[in-house]
Amino acid sequence: MPHYGFTLAEVLVTLGIIGVVSAMTVPALMQNYQRKSYVTQLHKVYNELQQTFLQFKTDRNAINLREAGITSADTLNAMTMQYFKIVESCSDATTVEPCFENPSKYKKLDGGSARAFDNADSGSFVLASGAAIRPWLSGNDNNAFIVYVVDINGRKGPNVFGRDFFDMCVDVNGTVDTCSDKAE
């Protein structure tokens, strides 16, 4: 009588091959997913900032943010509290915790210290989306009228500048852009 089926050795070899292929592809898939998640969260925060400044100017019938009333850290914080969906406010300007992770844990892509919380004249906030923001009024009429330090996923890691942690500059007209070295 003929036997139909696979031997135990054939089944184990097949399962081993499936395991090796899975072990090689799953990390790449997870990394791809994480990157797309960061991009989506960054777009969400960017759009929220852009829409907020447009709404703020429209409500005050102003042509720019200075005319709309943003002239100090206090007015910037008040606008932030009124126009964003804030779930946590860290109003002590001398510390970023608990809205952000400890500043020493923020790094650049090369592993160096990020030093992004040098401004001590504004509070920090956690948005309903989970992003943490810290506005700073530089007062320049160039591309860095307001600088927002943004951690798109709040206190969660990796807390690396350029991955989940960014500076966003807002010009006096309310246009949001990357800062690069414009805030200097």
Which positions does each model-derived feature cover?
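Aromatic-enriched hydrophobic runs in primary sequence
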Residues: P2, A9-V11, G16, H43-N47, ...
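Membrane-proximal N-terminal amphipathic helix
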Residues: Q31-L65, I70-N77
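Extended alpha-helical regions
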Residues: M1-P2, A9-V11, N61, L65, ...
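Intrinsically disordered, low-complexity regions enriched in Pro/Ser/Thr/Gly and acidic residues
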Residues: S72-E184
